Regions:
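FAD-dependent oxidoreductase catalytic-site/capping-region signature
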Residues: 2-8, 124, 130-179, 186-188, ...
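N-terminal glycine-rich phosphate/pyrophosphate-binding loop and immediately adjacent elements
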Residues: 2-128, 287, 297-306
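Short loop/edge segments at beta-strand edges and connector loops
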Residues: 218-220, 285-287, 481
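Residue-level detector of alpha-helix initiation sites
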Residues: 12, 16-21, 153, 258-259, ...
């Protein structure tokens, strides 16, 4: 157990997907001492591991930070819950388990903006390095990594029919969304092993738990990064009822996510001068971009009541249904309890001028009024659709120097008129798919937002009423070389030697799909960059060692 004056080669803050992978890679060198700090607890809560248990993890302080956004004018003044994992594995312990890389064009765009080494050709090997694909190694997939990818273990007639309806609407069927072009409709591949959630803790920490040079601490809340002049030397953290300094001889790497990483930087005096001075925080490095550029995927949840088919709604509202689901899962880890929240997906262009798919569907054999409430008692499915490349930008900032104060989260949803137009197009496209012959036998009736809403203005208003986060915040420590960029293409914080950020916050633009696996790729890249630098670096941060 480390003491207050412990010194490590690397201190990694945050044991989410990025932190778990990074700690694994850095500690592979037995001569390097690595410390991984996590604010949450161990991932021993049973509902983490049962796939449908995400319903009991989101909004649960045992596993979730339980953040909330500011009231959103674009959503009719509503404030949203903003789930972020607070447990070993981070969001990979509470998310939808979908394995999704995005599009080749996403990463090529990053590289075109001056981020050399981040094009699709550069990052594809990084995705493959950590992947254990059910079909084995191939041109597009890895077979020997730790991050397990499997087919789903349960199907529903209503989802098969939706896929047929999408095909009748001009959306081709596909079997693999992860080849660089995800256009089409198909079933998501998921991060599970034999019907059990496969989170980053299982993948990257458990196999190496006996490495003597790796220390993993839970229940550690990091307040700030401590500097010697401008160089990062240690983190100040609260652990086991006392304040500690954990020092790094080489580097500190923030993997605290799109909410946590900018907040730690700001409390460290690294951020917008005006904000820091208003909170009485000494400015160590004026960086106006810290906390800006917030992007998220806003999902529009269209619900359709159906006939002639069973959905999870009926099963979850029946004692016998619940018993049957439980017994089936106990028997062979299959059935509804083994299913990801969203099983069927589609990637579509909202209009012909889009170069690649800019809409993503998550189609679910269930419905509910809002997250945290019981499933409806009537049979229904939800066609959730989100704009993959929103133009709206928001911010995340601290409210005070106290690390226990909740951050100010303002995604600024639907503030850009372009996003409103895409939302209206998405609702119209969904209605067209649902009216296709393949779904006629189920007699779908629109429950939300309601068929009476037809004009452009009505659809704008409807989007604000049914829109909610799909939990993909990114971009708040943006990578690049501009005045508002926080890290360079090596993930080094501009102007602060010895400090990097390696998580979803560095994305210049959000990827076109779910963001967990791209975050793992970022950590894989960070590990390569750090180890390459360490091989040629003779300077060690001796100033990191606290003075007695």
């Amino acid at each position: 157990m480390p003491s207050a004056d412990s010194v490590f080669d690397y201190v990694v803050v945050g044991a989410g997907p990025a932190g778990c992978l990074l700690a694994n890679r850095l500690s592979a060198d037995p001569s390097c001492r690595v410390l991984l700090l996590e604010a949450g607890g161990r991932d021993n809560y049973p509902w983490i591991h049962i796939p449908v248990g995400y319903l009991y993890c989101i909004g649960n302080p045992r596993t979730d930070w339980c953040f909330k956004t500011e009231a959103q004018p674009g959503l009719g003044g509503r404030a949203l819950g903003y789930p972020r994992g607070k447990v070993l594995g981070g969001c990979s312990s509470i998310n939808g388990m979908i394995y999704m890389r995005g599009q080749a064009a996403d990463y090529d765009r990053w590289a075109e903006q001056g981020n050399d080494g981040w094009a699709w050709k550069d990052v594809l090997p990084l995705f493959k390095a950590s992947e254990s694909h059910f079909a084995g190694a191939s041109e597009h997939h890895g077979g020997d990594g730790e991050w397990r990818v499997e087919r789903q273990r349960y199907s529903w007639p209503i989802l098969d029919a939706f896929r047929d309806a999408a095909e009748q609407s001009g959306i081709d069927k596909v079997d693999d969304f992860n080849t660089g072009d995800n256009q089409g409709c198909g079933y998501f591949q998921v991060n599970q092993r034999s019907g059990v959630r496969w989170n980053a803790s299982k993948a990257f920490l458990r196999p190496i738990k006996d490495r003597p040079n790796l220390t993993v601490l839970t229940g550690v809340q990091v307040d700030q990064v401590l500097l010697n002049n401008t160089r990062a030397r240690a983190v100040k953290a609260f652990w086991q009822g006392a304040w500690h300094e954990f020092a790094a001889r080489r580097e500190i790497i923030l993997c605290a996510g799109a909410v946590g990483s900018p907040c730690i930087l700001q409390r460290s005096g690294i951020g917008p001068r005006q904000l820091l001075e208003s909170l009485g925080i000494g400015v160590r490095h004026d960086m106006p971009g810290v906390g800006g550029n917030l992007q998220d995927h806003l999902q529009l949840r269209l619900i359709y009541q159906i006939r002639n088919s069973r959905t999870l709604n009926q099963m979850a509202n029946s004692l016998w249904g619940k018993m049957g689901m439980g017994l089936r899962y106990l028997y062979d880890r299959s059935g509804p309890l083994a299913m990801a929240p969203s099983q069927l997906g589609a990637f579509v262009r909202s209009s012909p001028e889009q170069a690649t798919a800019n809409l993503q569907y998550h189609v679910q054999p269930l419905s509910l009024e809002r997250f945290g409430e019981p499933l409806h008692t009537f049979p229904a499915f939800t066609a959730s659709v989100c704009n993959l490349r929103p133009a709206s930008r928001g911010r995340i900032d601290i409210r005070s120097s106290d690390m226990n104060s909740t951050p100010l989260i303002d995604p600024n949803y639907l503030s850009d008129s372009q996003d409103l137009r895409v939302a209206a197009d998405a609702i119209r496209l969904t209605r067209r798919i649902v009216q296709a012959p393949a779904l006629a036998a189920f007699d779908p009736k629109e429950y939300l937002p309601g068929p009476a809403l037809q004009t452009e203005e009505e659809l704008f208003e409807a989007a604000g009423k049914i829109g909610t986060t799909i939990f993909h915040p990114v971009g708040t420590c943006r990578m690049g070389n501009g005045e508002l960029d926080v890290v360079d293409n090596q993930l080094r914080v501009h102007g602060i030697p010895g400090l990097r950020v390696a998580d979803a916050s560095i994305m210049p633009q959000i990827t076109s799909g779910n963001t967990c696996s791209p975050t793992l790729m970022i950590a894989e890249k960070a590990a390569q960059l750090i180890l390459k630098g360490a091989a040629t670096q003779t300077y060690l941060n001796e100033d990191a060692i606290p003075t007695p």
